[in-house]
Amino acid sequence: KEGPALMSRAVIADRYRLSWLALRRRLDILKGRATVHPLAGLFYWTSPGERLIIAPQELRTADPTRASEIYAGRFAFAGKIVICDGRSPFEMDPPNEEWAEELLGFSWLRHLRAADTAITRAHARALVDEWITLQGSWHPLAWQPEIVARRIISFLCQATLILDDADLRFYRRFLRNLTRQVRFLRATDTRDGIPRLQARIALTYASLCMAKQIRHLRGATRRLVQELERQVLPDGGHIGRNPGAIIEMLLDLLPLSQTFSARNVAPPPAITNAIDRMMPMLRFFRHGDGTFALFNGMGPTSSDVLATVLAYDDARGTPVANAPYSGYQRLDAASSMLLMDTGGPPPPELSAEAHAGCLAFEFSSKQQRVVVNCGMPGSGRENWRQVARATAAHSTVTFNDASSCRFLDFAPFRRLFGVPIVEGPENVTVARDSEHDAIVLRAAHDGYAERFGIIHERFVSLSADGNRLEGEDVFLPATGNAMPDEADDRFAVRFHLHPAIRANRLTDGHGAVLLLPNKDVWNLNAHEDVVAVEDSVYLAGHDGPRRTSQIVIYGRAREVHRVHWSFSHVPQTTPAGWRGSPREQLPP
Protein backbone atom coordinates (compact mmCIF):
# COMPACT_ATOMS: atom_id res chain seq x y z
CA LYS A 1 0.00 0.00 0.00
CA GLU A 2 2.97 2.28 0.40
CA GLY A 3 4.41 1.75 -3.09
CA PRO A 4 4.85 4.46 -5.73
CA ALA A 5 1.69 3.35 -7.56
CA LEU A 6 -0.46 4.56 -4.68
CA MET A 7 1.46 7.77 -3.99
CA SER A 8 -1.04 10.46 -3.15
CA ARG A 9 -1.50 13.62 -5.16
CA ALA A 10 -0.06 15.59 -2.25
CA VAL A 11 3.20 13.63 -2.44
CA ILE A 12 3.43 14.19 -6.20
CA ALA A 13 2.77 17.91 -5.72
CA ASP A 14 5.50 18.08 -3.08
CA ARG A 15 7.93 16.34 -5.44
CA TYR A 16 7.25 18.95 -8.11
CA ARG A 17 7.66 21.73 -5.56
CA LEU A 18 10.99 20.32 -4.41
CA SER A 19 12.06 19.97 -8.05
CA TRP A 20 11.35 23.66 -8.59
CA LEU A 21 13.24 24.59 -5.42
CA ALA A 22 16.17 22.43 -6.51
CA LEU A 23 16.27 24.18 -9.89
CA ARG A 24 16.18 27.59 -8.21
CA ARG A 25 18.98 26.52 -5.88
CA ARG A 26 21.22 25.48 -8.75
CA LEU A 27 20.51 28.71 -10.62
CA ASP A 28 21.35 30.70 -7.47
CA ILE A 29 24.68 28.91 -7.13
CA LEU A 30 25.49 29.62 -10.78
CA LYS A 31 24.64 33.26 -10.18
CA GLY A 32 26.84 33.33 -7.10
CA ARG A 33 29.67 31.63 -8.96
CA ALA A 34 29.56 34.40 -11.55
CA THR A 35 30.35 36.91 -8.80
CA VAL A 36 33.64 35.16 -7.95
CA HIS A 37 34.78 34.62 -11.53
CA PRO A 38 38.14 36.29 -12.31
CA LEU A 39 36.30 38.65 -14.69
CA ALA A 40 33.63 39.47 -12.09
CA GLY A 41 35.11 42.90 -11.59
CA LEU A 42 33.79 43.90 -15.00
CA PHE A 43 30.21 43.26 -13.90
CA TYR A 44 30.14 43.31 -10.08
CA TRP A 45 31.75 46.23 -8.35
CA THR A 46 32.31 45.82 -4.63
CA SER A 47 34.70 47.85 -2.53
CA PRO A 48 37.17 45.55 -0.79
CA GLY A 49 36.98 45.53 2.98
CA GLU A 50 40.31 47.29 3.45
CA ARG A 51 40.51 46.40 7.11
CA LEU A 52 38.65 44.58 9.82
CA ILE A 53 37.19 46.79 12.52
CA ILE A 54 36.09 44.20 15.07
CA ALA A 55 36.22 40.44 15.65
CA PRO A 56 33.01 38.99 17.11
CA GLN A 57 33.06 36.74 20.14
CA GLU A 58 32.94 32.96 19.61
CA LEU A 59 30.61 31.19 22.06
CA ARG A 60 31.24 27.63 20.90
CA THR A 61 33.49 25.91 23.40
CA ALA A 62 37.07 25.18 22.42
CA ASP A 63 39.55 22.48 23.41
CA PRO A 64 43.24 23.50 23.29
CA THR A 65 44.30 19.84 23.12
CA ARG A 66 42.67 19.65 19.69
CA ALA A 67 45.21 22.25 18.54
CA SER A 68 48.03 19.74 19.10
CA GLU A 69 46.18 17.14 17.03
CA ILE A 70 45.64 19.60 14.20
CA TYR A 71 49.30 20.65 14.32
CA ALA A 72 50.25 16.97 14.05
CA GLY A 73 48.06 16.65 10.95
CA ARG A 74 45.21 14.73 12.62
CA PHE A 75 41.87 16.20 11.61
CA ALA A 76 39.02 14.57 13.53
CA PHE A 77 35.56 15.65 12.38
CA ALA A 78 32.18 13.94 12.14
CA GLY A 79 33.41 10.76 13.81
CA LYS A 80 36.24 10.29 11.27
CA ILE A 81 39.99 10.94 11.51
CA VAL A 82 42.19 11.89 8.56
CA ILE A 83 45.96 11.86 9.03
CA CYS A 84 47.59 14.18 6.54
CA ASP A 85 51.24 13.02 6.79
CA GLY A 86 52.59 16.40 5.72
CA ARG A 87 49.97 17.08 3.05
CA SER A 88 47.39 19.83 3.19
CA PRO A 89 44.03 18.69 4.61
CA PHE A 90 42.41 20.41 1.64
CA GLU A 91 44.18 17.98 -0.70
CA MET A 92 43.02 14.86 1.14
CA ASP A 93 40.14 12.66 0.05
CA PRO A 94 37.42 13.22 2.68
CA PRO A 95 36.06 10.05 4.36
CA ASN A 96 32.54 11.46 4.12
CA GLU A 97 30.79 14.68 3.20
CA GLU A 98 30.16 15.67 6.83
CA TRP A 99 33.91 15.56 7.52
CA ALA A 100 34.56 17.77 4.49
CA GLU A 101 31.86 20.24 5.49
CA GLU A 102 33.35 20.65 8.98
CA LEU A 103 36.83 21.09 7.56
CA LEU A 104 35.71 23.70 5.03
CA GLY A 105 33.58 25.59 7.56
CA PHE A 106 36.72 26.38 9.66
CA SER A 107 34.86 26.31 12.99
CA TRP A 108 37.80 24.27 14.28
CA LEU A 109 39.98 27.40 14.25
CA ARG A 110 38.62 28.12 17.73
CA HIS A 111 40.66 25.21 19.10
CA LEU A 112 43.85 26.79 17.77
CA ARG A 113 42.86 30.09 19.32
CA ALA A 114 42.28 28.38 22.67
CA ALA A 115 45.90 27.17 22.65
CA ASP A 116 47.03 30.78 21.98
CA THR A 117 50.68 30.26 21.12
CA ALA A 118 52.82 31.74 18.37
CA ILE A 119 52.97 28.29 16.76
CA THR A 120 49.19 27.84 16.65
CA ARG A 121 48.72 31.35 15.28
CA ALA A 122 51.24 30.71 12.51
CA HIS A 123 49.67 27.31 11.84
CA ALA A 124 46.18 28.81 11.58
CA ARG A 125 47.45 31.42 9.15
CA ALA A 126 49.21 28.76 7.06
CA LEU A 127 46.07 26.61 6.86
CA VAL A 128 43.91 29.55 5.81
CA ASP A 129 46.52 30.51 3.22
CA GLU A 130 46.53 26.92 1.87
CA TRP A 131 42.77 26.97 1.50
CA ILE A 132 42.83 30.31 -0.33
CA THR A 133 45.45 28.91 -2.72
CA LEU A 134 43.70 25.58 -3.36
CA GLN A 135 40.01 26.41 -3.13
CA GLY A 136 39.71 30.16 -2.61
CA SER A 137 38.62 30.80 -6.19
CA TRP A 138 36.16 27.94 -6.54
CA HIS A 139 35.44 24.42 -5.31
CA PRO A 140 32.08 22.64 -5.74
CA LEU A 141 31.71 21.76 -2.05
CA ALA A 142 33.69 24.56 -0.40
CA TRP A 143 31.53 27.13 -2.16
CA GLN A 144 28.18 25.69 -1.18
CA PRO A 145 26.34 28.70 0.33
CA GLU A 146 25.80 27.17 3.79
CA ILE A 147 29.51 26.32 4.05
CA VAL A 148 30.52 29.78 2.84
CA ALA A 149 28.29 31.31 5.54
CA ARG A 150 29.88 29.21 8.27
CA ARG A 151 33.37 30.03 6.97
CA ILE A 152 32.71 33.79 6.89
CA ILE A 153 31.57 33.66 10.52
CA SER A 154 34.63 31.57 11.47
CA PHE A 155 37.07 33.87 9.67
CA LEU A 156 35.56 36.95 11.31
CA CYS A 157 35.40 35.46 14.81
CA GLN A 158 38.97 34.15 14.56
CA ALA A 159 40.40 37.16 12.72
CA THR A 160 42.69 38.00 15.65
CA LEU A 161 44.16 34.49 15.53
CA ILE A 162 44.58 34.54 11.74
CA LEU A 163 45.94 38.07 11.33
CA ASP A 164 48.06 38.52 14.44
CA ASP A 165 51.70 38.93 13.28
CA ALA A 166 50.60 38.59 9.63
CA ASP A 167 52.50 40.53 6.98
CA LEU A 168 50.75 43.07 4.78
CA ARG A 169 50.67 40.72 1.76
CA PHE A 170 48.72 38.02 3.62
CA TYR A 171 46.50 40.61 5.31
CA ARG A 172 45.38 41.97 1.92
CA ARG A 173 45.10 38.49 0.40
CA PHE A 174 42.89 37.35 3.28
CA LEU A 175 40.61 40.40 3.03
CA ARG A 176 40.30 40.06 -0.74
CA ASN A 177 39.18 36.47 -0.34
CA LEU A 178 36.81 37.32 2.49
CA THR A 179 35.26 40.06 0.35
CA ARG A 180 34.86 37.55 -2.47
CA GLN A 181 33.03 35.14 -0.17
CA VAL A 182 30.73 37.89 1.11
CA ARG A 183 29.96 38.95 -2.46
CA PHE A 184 29.15 35.35 -3.41
CA LEU A 185 26.86 34.84 -0.41
CA ARG A 186 25.06 38.12 -1.02
CA ALA A 187 24.21 36.97 -4.57
CA THR A 188 23.20 33.42 -3.61
CA ASP A 189 20.19 32.04 -1.80
CA THR A 190 20.74 29.31 0.76
CA ARG A 191 18.59 26.29 1.49
CA ASP A 192 15.78 27.00 3.91
CA GLY A 193 15.98 26.72 7.68
CA ILE A 194 19.05 27.20 9.86
CA PRO A 195 21.46 27.40 6.84
CA ARG A 196 19.56 30.37 5.42
CA LEU A 197 19.43 32.07 8.81
CA GLN A 198 23.18 31.54 9.27
CA ALA A 199 23.78 33.09 5.85
CA ARG A 200 21.82 36.18 6.88
CA ILE A 201 23.79 36.33 10.14
CA ALA A 202 27.10 35.99 8.26
CA LEU A 203 26.25 38.91 5.97
CA THR A 204 25.21 41.05 8.93
CA TYR A 205 28.48 40.21 10.69
CA ALA A 206 30.41 41.18 7.55
CA SER A 207 28.59 44.52 7.34
CA LEU A 208 29.51 45.29 10.94
CA CYS A 209 33.08 43.99 10.97
CA MET A 210 34.50 44.97 7.58
CA ALA A 211 35.34 48.62 7.00
CA LYS A 212 33.82 49.06 3.55
CA GLN A 213 30.81 46.80 4.09
CA ILE A 214 28.89 49.07 6.48
CA ARG A 215 26.85 50.43 3.56
CA HIS A 216 25.27 46.96 3.24
CA LEU A 217 24.21 46.86 6.90
CA ARG A 218 20.65 48.09 6.38
CA GLY A 219 19.90 45.54 3.66
CA ALA A 220 21.61 42.69 5.53
CA THR A 221 19.74 43.52 8.72
CA ARG A 222 16.41 43.74 6.92
CA ARG A 223 16.85 40.28 5.41
CA LEU A 224 17.98 38.84 8.74
CA VAL A 225 14.93 40.27 10.50
CA GLN A 226 12.66 38.76 7.84
CA GLU A 227 14.15 35.31 8.45
CA LEU A 228 13.97 35.64 12.23
CA GLU A 229 10.32 36.60 12.07
CA ARG A 230 9.62 33.64 9.81
CA GLN A 231 11.76 30.98 11.48
CA VAL A 232 11.48 31.82 15.20
CA LEU A 233 7.94 31.02 16.27
CA PRO A 234 5.99 33.15 18.77
CA ASP A 235 6.70 30.68 21.60
CA GLY A 236 10.45 30.67 20.82
CA GLY A 237 10.69 27.36 18.98
CA HIS A 238 12.09 26.91 15.51
CA ILE A 239 9.92 26.36 12.45
CA GLY A 240 11.82 23.11 11.71
CA ARG A 241 10.82 21.78 15.18
CA ASN A 242 14.33 20.62 16.15
CA PRO A 243 15.02 21.65 19.78
CA GLY A 244 18.74 21.80 19.01
CA ALA A 245 18.14 24.54 16.44
CA ILE A 246 17.46 26.94 19.32
CA ILE A 247 20.96 26.40 20.68
CA GLU A 248 22.50 26.84 17.22
CA MET A 249 20.65 30.12 16.63
CA LEU A 250 21.57 31.56 20.01
CA LEU A 251 25.26 30.68 19.56
CA ASP A 252 25.31 33.10 16.62
CA LEU A 253 22.68 35.66 17.63
CA LEU A 254 24.03 36.42 21.11
CA PRO A 255 27.49 37.54 19.89
CA LEU A 256 25.87 39.29 16.92
CA SER A 257 23.86 41.42 19.33
CA GLN A 258 27.08 42.24 21.19
CA THR A 259 28.77 43.17 17.92
CA PHE A 260 26.04 45.71 17.17
CA SER A 261 26.66 47.28 20.58
CA ALA A 262 30.43 47.28 20.06
CA ARG A 263 29.91 49.30 16.86
CA ASN A 264 27.61 51.71 18.74
CA VAL A 265 24.68 50.56 16.62
CA ALA A 266 21.46 49.54 18.34
CA PRO A 267 20.57 45.94 17.42
CA PRO A 268 17.21 45.66 15.67
CA PRO A 269 14.39 44.94 18.15
CA ALA A 270 13.57 41.77 16.19
CA ILE A 271 16.94 40.27 17.15
CA THR A 272 16.47 41.08 20.83
CA ASN A 273 12.89 39.83 20.77
CA ALA A 274 13.90 36.57 19.10
CA ILE A 275 16.58 35.97 21.74
CA ASP A 276 14.12 36.75 24.54
CA ARG A 277 11.60 34.25 23.11
CA MET A 278 14.16 31.49 22.62
CA MET A 279 15.79 31.65 26.05
CA PRO A 280 12.83 30.14 28.00
CA MET A 281 12.68 27.30 25.46
CA LEU A 282 16.15 26.18 26.56
CA ARG A 283 14.63 25.29 29.93
CA PHE A 284 11.44 23.97 28.33
CA PHE A 285 13.27 21.15 26.53
CA ARG A 286 15.64 20.25 29.39
CA HIS A 287 15.31 17.13 31.51
CA GLY A 288 16.41 17.01 35.14
CA ASP A 289 19.86 15.79 34.09
CA GLY A 290 20.34 18.88 31.90
CA THR A 291 19.99 17.13 28.54
CA PHE A 292 17.53 18.09 25.82
CA ALA A 293 14.55 15.93 24.92
CA LEU A 294 15.09 13.83 21.78
CA PHE A 295 12.58 15.10 19.25
CA ASN A 296 12.84 15.95 15.54
CA GLY A 297 16.56 15.79 14.91
CA MET A 298 17.88 16.38 18.43
CA GLY A 299 20.98 14.31 19.15
CA PRO A 300 23.57 14.36 21.94
CA THR A 301 23.40 17.45 24.15
CA SER A 302 26.65 19.36 24.53
CA SER A 303 26.41 20.29 28.20
CA ASP A 304 29.21 22.87 28.07
CA VAL A 305 27.67 24.65 25.07
CA LEU A 306 24.25 24.65 26.72
CA ALA A 307 25.73 26.03 29.95
CA THR A 308 27.45 28.81 27.98
CA VAL A 309 24.20 29.87 26.34
CA LEU A 310 22.18 29.59 29.56
CA ALA A 311 24.63 31.98 31.24
CA TYR A 312 23.04 34.72 29.10
CA ASP A 313 19.57 33.97 30.50
CA ASP A 314 18.94 36.75 33.00
CA ALA A 315 15.42 35.62 33.88
CA ARG A 316 16.29 32.03 34.90
CA GLY A 317 12.61 31.39 35.41
CA THR A 318 10.46 28.28 35.51
CA PRO A 319 10.08 26.64 32.09
CA VAL A 320 6.90 27.40 30.22
CA ALA A 321 4.44 24.50 30.10
CA ASN A 322 2.86 25.03 26.73
CA ALA A 323 4.53 25.60 23.36
CA PRO A 324 1.56 25.42 20.97
CA TYR A 325 3.26 27.03 17.98
CA SER A 326 6.23 24.67 18.20
CA GLY A 327 3.95 21.70 18.84
CA TYR A 328 5.15 20.54 22.26
CA GLN A 329 3.65 20.18 25.72
CA ARG A 330 5.41 19.90 29.08
CA LEU A 331 4.01 18.50 32.33
CA ASP A 332 5.88 19.23 35.59
CA ALA A 333 4.98 17.83 38.99
CA ALA A 334 7.39 17.75 41.94
CA SER A 335 10.56 16.06 40.61
CA SER A 336 8.94 14.43 37.57
CA MET A 337 8.63 15.84 34.07
CA LEU A 338 7.02 14.78 30.79
CA LEU A 339 7.50 16.30 27.33
CA MET A 340 5.22 15.34 24.44
CA ASP A 341 5.35 16.01 20.69
CA THR A 342 1.93 17.40 19.76
CA GLY A 343 2.72 18.87 16.36
CA GLY A 344 2.67 17.87 12.72
CA PRO A 345 5.71 17.81 10.43
CA PRO A 346 7.19 21.08 9.11
CA PRO A 347 7.00 21.92 5.37
CA PRO A 348 8.97 19.46 3.19
CA GLU A 349 11.84 21.86 2.50
CA LEU A 350 12.33 22.26 6.27
CA SER A 351 11.82 18.62 7.24
CA ALA A 352 15.22 17.04 6.50
CA GLU A 353 15.71 16.39 10.23
CA ALA A 354 12.06 16.06 11.31
CA HIS A 355 10.81 12.77 12.73
CA ALA A 356 7.60 10.77 12.47
CA GLY A 357 7.11 10.97 16.24
CA CYS A 358 3.70 12.57 16.74
CA LEU A 359 2.36 11.99 20.30
CA ALA A 360 5.69 10.51 21.41
CA PHE A 361 6.75 11.49 24.92
CA GLU A 362 9.79 11.46 27.17
CA PHE A 363 9.55 11.11 30.95
CA SER A 364 12.13 11.77 33.64
CA SER A 365 12.24 11.49 37.42
CA LYS A 366 14.63 13.69 39.37
CA GLN A 367 17.94 13.66 37.46
CA GLN A 368 17.20 10.47 35.54
CA ARG A 369 15.55 10.04 32.18
CA VAL A 370 13.24 7.02 32.19
CA VAL A 371 11.24 6.93 28.94
CA VAL A 372 13.01 8.40 25.92
CA ASN A 373 13.01 8.41 22.15
CA CYS A 374 15.95 6.84 20.34
CA GLY A 375 17.24 10.27 19.26
CA MET A 376 19.36 11.36 16.32
CA PRO A 377 22.89 9.90 16.23
CA GLY A 378 25.92 12.13 16.16
CA SER A 379 27.62 13.04 12.91
CA GLY A 380 29.29 10.33 10.89
CA ARG A 381 26.60 7.68 11.47
CA GLU A 382 24.46 8.00 8.37
CA ASN A 383 23.36 4.36 8.57
CA TRP A 384 21.35 5.15 11.72
CA ARG A 385 19.85 8.51 10.80
CA GLN A 386 16.81 7.30 8.88
CA VAL A 387 16.18 4.61 11.49
CA ALA A 388 16.03 7.35 14.13
CA ARG A 389 13.32 9.23 12.21
CA ALA A 390 10.87 6.32 11.99
CA THR A 391 7.84 6.20 14.30
CA ALA A 392 9.09 2.91 15.77
CA ALA A 393 12.11 4.79 17.20
CA HIS A 394 9.77 6.85 19.39
CA SER A 395 7.74 6.24 22.52
CA THR A 396 4.39 6.29 20.80
CA VAL A 397 2.10 3.97 18.81
CA THR A 398 2.86 2.42 15.42
CA PHE A 399 0.38 0.66 13.14
CA ASN A 400 1.44 -2.21 10.90
CA ASP A 401 5.12 -1.37 11.43
CA ALA A 402 4.61 1.81 9.39
CA SER A 403 5.58 5.38 10.24
CA SER A 404 2.98 8.09 10.69
CA CYS A 405 4.81 10.15 8.04
CA ARG A 406 5.97 9.40 4.51
CA PHE A 407 9.61 10.14 3.66
CA LEU A 408 10.76 10.94 0.13
CA ASP A 409 14.17 9.37 -0.45
CA PHE A 410 14.79 10.67 -3.96
CA ALA A 411 18.43 10.73 -5.05
CA PRO A 412 18.31 14.06 -7.00
CA PHE A 413 16.99 15.84 -3.88
CA ARG A 414 19.25 14.24 -1.29
CA ARG A 415 22.11 16.76 -1.52
CA LEU A 416 19.75 19.75 -1.37
CA PHE A 417 16.92 18.58 0.89
CA GLY A 418 18.07 15.33 2.50
CA VAL A 419 15.15 12.91 2.91
CA PRO A 420 12.16 15.20 3.49
CA ILE A 421 8.76 14.36 4.92
CA VAL A 422 6.13 14.78 2.23
CA GLU A 423 3.08 13.49 4.07
CA GLY A 424 2.16 13.21 7.73
CA PRO A 425 -0.41 14.16 10.36
CA GLU A 426 -2.46 17.11 9.15
CA ASN A 427 -4.85 17.47 12.08
CA VAL A 428 -3.22 17.30 15.50
CA THR A 429 -5.50 18.30 18.35
CA VAL A 430 -4.39 18.97 21.90
CA ALA A 431 -6.18 19.96 25.11
CA ARG A 432 -4.69 20.61 28.53
CA ASP A 433 -6.53 20.57 31.86
CA SER A 434 -6.31 19.77 35.56
CA GLU A 435 -8.32 16.99 37.16
CA HIS A 436 -8.14 15.76 40.77
CA ASP A 437 -4.85 17.58 41.45
CA ALA A 438 -3.28 16.07 38.32
CA ILE A 439 -2.18 17.71 35.07
CA VAL A 440 -4.04 16.16 32.15
CA LEU A 441 -3.13 16.20 28.47
CA ARG A 442 -5.27 14.88 25.62
CA ALA A 443 -4.00 14.81 22.04
CA ALA A 444 -4.82 13.05 18.78
CA HIS A 445 -3.44 12.82 15.24
CA ASP A 446 -4.57 11.50 11.86
CA GLY A 447 -1.24 10.28 10.49
CA TYR A 448 -2.65 6.78 9.99
CA ALA A 449 -6.10 7.81 8.81
CA GLU A 450 -5.54 7.72 5.04
CA ARG A 451 -3.66 4.41 4.92
CA PHE A 452 -5.25 2.42 7.74
CA GLY A 453 -8.43 4.30 8.67
CA ILE A 454 -7.37 4.91 12.28
CA ILE A 455 -7.14 8.01 14.48
CA HIS A 456 -4.68 7.73 17.37
CA GLU A 457 -5.69 9.53 20.55
CA ARG A 458 -3.42 9.68 23.60
CA PHE A 459 -4.32 10.71 27.15
CA VAL A 460 -1.69 11.31 29.86
CA SER A 461 -2.09 12.47 33.45
CA LEU A 462 0.72 13.30 35.89
CA SER A 463 -0.16 13.33 39.59
CA ALA A 464 0.62 16.39 41.69
CA ASP A 465 3.32 14.55 43.67
CA GLY A 466 4.96 13.34 40.45
CA ASN A 467 4.78 9.71 41.55
CA ARG A 468 2.22 8.44 39.05
CA LEU A 469 1.90 8.85 35.30
CA GLU A 470 -1.37 7.52 33.88
CA GLY A 471 -1.80 7.00 30.16
CA GLU A 472 -4.29 5.67 27.68
CA ASP A 473 -4.03 5.15 23.93
CA VAL A 474 -7.35 5.09 22.09
CA PHE A 475 -7.88 3.90 18.51
CA LEU A 476 -10.83 5.43 16.69
CA PRO A 477 -12.16 4.83 13.17
CA ALA A 478 -11.23 7.71 10.89
CA THR A 479 -14.62 7.61 9.14
CA GLY A 480 -17.93 6.36 10.51
CA ASN A 481 -17.95 3.47 12.96
CA ALA A 482 -16.01 0.93 10.91
CA MET A 483 -12.58 -0.19 12.10
CA PRO A 484 -9.97 -1.13 9.50
CA ASP A 485 -9.57 -4.57 7.96
CA GLU A 486 -7.95 -7.12 10.22
CA ALA A 487 -4.79 -7.06 8.10
CA ASP A 488 -4.36 -3.33 8.78
CA ASP A 489 -5.09 -3.11 12.50
CA ARG A 490 -1.89 -4.38 14.17
CA PHE A 491 -0.57 -1.86 16.68
CA ALA A 492 2.45 -1.57 18.97
CA VAL A 493 2.62 0.82 21.92
CA ARG A 494 6.32 1.42 22.57
CA PHE A 495 8.16 2.82 25.58
CA HIS A 496 11.88 3.13 24.84
CA LEU A 497 13.96 3.22 28.02
CA HIS A 498 17.13 5.16 28.73
CA PRO A 499 20.21 2.87 28.70
CA ALA A 500 20.75 3.49 32.42
CA ILE A 501 17.37 1.88 33.22
CA ARG A 502 17.16 -1.86 33.90
CA ALA A 503 13.82 -3.48 33.11
CA ASN A 504 12.36 -6.79 34.27
CA ARG A 505 9.02 -8.18 33.08
CA LEU A 506 6.58 -9.06 35.84
CA THR A 507 5.68 -12.73 36.20
CA ASP A 508 2.04 -12.12 35.25
CA GLY A 509 3.14 -10.45 32.01
CA HIS A 510 1.03 -7.35 32.59
CA GLY A 511 3.85 -4.99 33.44
CA ALA A 512 7.51 -4.45 34.19
CA VAL A 513 9.61 -3.14 37.04
CA LEU A 514 12.22 -0.47 36.28
CA LEU A 515 15.35 0.11 38.36
CA LEU A 516 16.95 3.55 38.08
CA PRO A 517 20.66 4.24 38.73
CA ASN A 518 19.76 6.08 41.95
CA LYS A 519 18.01 2.85 43.14
CA ASP A 520 14.55 4.34 42.68
CA VAL A 521 12.03 1.79 41.42
CA TRP A 522 9.15 2.44 39.04
CA ASN A 523 6.49 0.00 37.92
CA LEU A 524 4.93 -0.02 34.48
CA ASN A 525 1.46 -1.55 34.66
CA ALA A 526 -0.36 -2.43 31.44
CA HIS A 527 -3.46 -3.55 33.38
CA GLU A 528 -5.36 -5.91 31.04
CA ASP A 529 -2.69 -6.06 28.33
CA VAL A 530 0.46 -8.14 28.08
CA VAL A 531 3.84 -6.43 27.71
CA ALA A 532 7.07 -7.55 26.11
CA VAL A 533 10.54 -6.36 27.09
CA GLU A 534 12.59 -6.18 23.90
CA ASP A 535 15.93 -4.85 22.73
CA SER A 536 16.16 -1.26 21.55
CA VAL A 537 18.93 1.16 20.69
CA TYR A 538 19.73 4.56 22.15
CA LEU A 539 21.24 6.59 19.32
CA ALA A 540 21.89 9.96 20.97
CA GLY A 541 24.87 8.96 23.09
CA HIS A 542 28.13 10.88 22.89
CA ASP A 543 29.95 7.55 22.58
CA GLY A 544 27.76 6.19 19.81
CA PRO A 545 24.72 3.88 19.72
CA ARG A 546 24.04 1.91 22.90
CA ARG A 547 21.90 -1.11 23.60
CA THR A 548 18.86 -0.47 25.72
CA SER A 549 15.37 -1.90 26.27
CA GLN A 550 11.89 -1.05 25.15
CA ILE A 551 8.60 -2.15 26.63
CA VAL A 552 6.03 -2.96 23.96
CA ILE A 553 2.31 -3.68 24.10
CA TYR A 554 1.02 -5.45 20.98
CA GLY A 555 -2.56 -5.85 19.84
CA ARG A 556 -5.20 -5.41 17.15
CA ALA A 557 -7.35 -2.30 17.02
CA ARG A 558 -10.45 -4.31 16.01
CA GLU A 559 -10.21 -6.21 19.29
CA VAL A 560 -8.66 -3.62 21.62
CA HIS A 561 -9.86 -0.04 21.23
CA ARG A 562 -8.09 1.24 24.36
CA VAL A 563 -4.75 0.48 25.95
CA HIS A 564 -4.45 1.71 29.53
CA TRP A 565 -1.00 1.94 31.10
CA SER A 566 0.65 3.65 34.06
CA PHE A 567 4.07 4.34 35.54
CA SER A 568 4.13 4.50 39.34
CA HIS A 569 6.97 5.17 41.74
CA VAL A 570 7.58 2.39 44.26
CA PRO A 571 8.93 3.54 47.65
CA GLN A 572 11.43 0.68 48.05
CA THR A 573 14.93 -0.42 47.06
CA THR A 574 15.99 -3.04 44.52
CA PRO A 575 13.19 -5.60 44.19
CA ALA A 576 13.78 -9.20 45.20
CA GLY A 577 14.65 -11.62 42.44
CA TRP A 578 16.04 -8.87 40.22
CA ARG A 579 17.42 -10.25 36.96
CA GLY A 580 18.19 -7.10 34.95
CA SER A 581 21.63 -6.36 33.56
CA PRO A 582 23.36 -3.20 32.38
CA ARG A 583 23.20 -2.36 28.71
CA GLU A 584 26.16 -2.64 26.37
CA GLN A 585 27.50 -0.33 23.74
CA LEU A 586 26.60 -1.17 20.14
CA PRO A 587 29.17 -1.24 17.36
CA PRO A 588 28.93 1.75 15.00
Predicted regions located by residue number:
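Aromatic-lined, polymer-binding surfaces characteristic
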Residues: 96-275
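Carbohydrate-active enzyme catalytic cores, enriched for enzymes
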Residues: 233-376
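CBM-like, beta-strand-rich accessory domains located in the C-terminal region of large
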Residues: 3, 8-9, 91, 149, ...
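Short solvent-exposed loop/turn micro-motifs enriched in small/polar/acidic residues
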Residues: 67-68, 322-324, 354-356, 390, ...
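Long, acidic, intrinsically disordered low-complexity segments
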Residues: 40-66, 80-114, 195-207
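Residues that flank catalytic or metal-binding motifs in active/ligand-binding sites
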Residues: 104, 199, 327, 359, ...
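Extreme N-terminal leader/anchor segments
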Residues: 2-85
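Short acidic-hydrophobic surface loop/beta-edge motif
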Residues: 75, 329-333, 361-363, 506, ...
